[in-house]
């Protein structure tokens, strides 16, 4: 390294000395050489990259250009006769990466960091970087725009994406997987206060009214609780636990769902409910529904397991029922009849 630096200094010294010793000359055929510039109709030596012209050639004294090395934070990248070196660009922004550092022969270059694209290009890299579009769950990166932003496309049959990302593409569906678990709970309320619902989420998820609490626990599968919806549609209050349609479950394990319907009364007796519908066949799963006490409301639980990786959309449907089927036209509380609140959730498949 020292020998290289010494050679470079010696080279510059030679230029400075030669600049003094070699006199400017008249153009040949009206032109100067590539490493020269024309001043007062004389061809004078240019300074090489990394230096500047601290003194121009002088026809009166018959002396050539004097070149001086650039200082720290400055540069010249080509032959020149500039009166001073150029200042390097400042440090890169937080959303940029430095692809070339500042030295005496090159400017600093900043490019956009991963996850960003260039909105405004300059002669030395990008001047303004902005965040790339992030593809949501069920969508993957399929290309880029002319400016470098991400193009998102829905994952096709046999592919999936379960991330929110500006880099991930749709991936092939792993073998032995299914991807949709829908748990719908229909409540036929019997009093005004039972129209009100509260929810909790997590591994143990619950829906509560003034009369009962329904809790769902799950193991070896992931029926994610989305923004559930509560509505009075045809005088039926409906709540639901839903998965996203592109969340894949490993069917090498048995998906286990355990429900408890606990009535808010003094009756502590419990019993296991019997399935009213059972279409087992396409994937392993296990369910139990325990009723504690005796509720007045009618409760229907529907569980739908779907394999959306097949063209015909194979499904297993499990259902349970507890309570008396009410004459809702005669017994529906007045407040339930006018209470309508629907949030962003997937529509039910059963109503």
UniProtKB/Swiss-Prot annotation:
Xref: SUPFAM superfamilies: TNF receptor-like (SSF57586)
Q: One cellular component GO annotation, for this chain's record?
A: extracellular region
- Cited SMART domains: TNFR
Pfam families membership: CrmD_SECRET, TNFR_c6
State the UniProt keywords alphabetically: Disulfide bond, Glycoprotein, Receptor, Repeat, Secreted, Signal
- Name the job this protein performs: Inhibits host immune defense by binding to host TNF and various chemokines in the extracellular space. Binds host CC chemokines (beta chemokines) and CXC chemokines (alpha chemokines).
The protein in question is named Soluble TNF receptor II
Q: Which organism is it from?
A: Cowpox virus (strain GRI-90 / Grishak) (CPV)
User: Gene name, please?
Assistant: OPG002
């Amino acid at each position: 390294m020292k020998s290289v630096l010494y050679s470079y200094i010696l080279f510059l010294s030679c230029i400075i000395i030669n600049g003094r010793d070699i006199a400017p000359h008249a153009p040949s055929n009206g032109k100067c050489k590539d490493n020269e510039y024309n001043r007062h109709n004389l061809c004078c030596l240019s300074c090489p990259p990394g230096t500047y012209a601290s003194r121009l050639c002088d026809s009166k004294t018959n002396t050539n250009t004097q070149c001086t090395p650039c200082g720290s934070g400055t540069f010249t990248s080509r032959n020149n006769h500039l009166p001073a070196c150029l200042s390097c660009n400042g440090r890169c922004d937080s959303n940029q990466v430095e692809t070339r550092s500042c030295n005496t022969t090159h400017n600093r270059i900043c490019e956009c960091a991963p996850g960003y694209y260039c909105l405004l290009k300059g002669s030395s890299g990008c001047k303004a970087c902005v965040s790339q579009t992030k593809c949501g769950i069920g969508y993957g990166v399929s290309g880029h725009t002319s400016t470098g932003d991400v193009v998102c496309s829905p994952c096709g049959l046999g592919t999936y994406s379960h991330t929110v990302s500006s880099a991930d593409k749709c991936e092939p569906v792993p073998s032995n997987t299914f991807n949709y678990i829908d748990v719908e709970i229909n409540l036929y309320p019997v009093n005004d206060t039972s129209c009100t619902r509260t929810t909790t989420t997590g591994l143990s998820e619950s829906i509560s009214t003034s009369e009962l609490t329904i809790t769902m626990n799950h193991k070896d599968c992931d029926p994610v609780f989305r923004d559930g919806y509560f509505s009075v549609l045809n005088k039926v209050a409906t709540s639901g636990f839903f998965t996203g349609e592109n969340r894949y479950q490993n069917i090498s394990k048995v998906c286990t769902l355990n429900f408890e319907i606990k009535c808010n009364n003094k009756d502590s007796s419990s019993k296991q409910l019997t399935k009213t519908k059972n279409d087992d066949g396409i994937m392993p799963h296990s369910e139990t529904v325990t009723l504690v006490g005796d509720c007045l409301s009618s409760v229907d639980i529907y569980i739908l397991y779907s394999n959306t990786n097949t063209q015909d959309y194979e499904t297993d449907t499990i259902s349970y029922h507890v309570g008396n089927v009410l004459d809702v036209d005669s017994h529906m509380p007045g407040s339930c009849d006018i209470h309508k609140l629907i949030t962003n959730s997937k529509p039910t498949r059963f109503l």
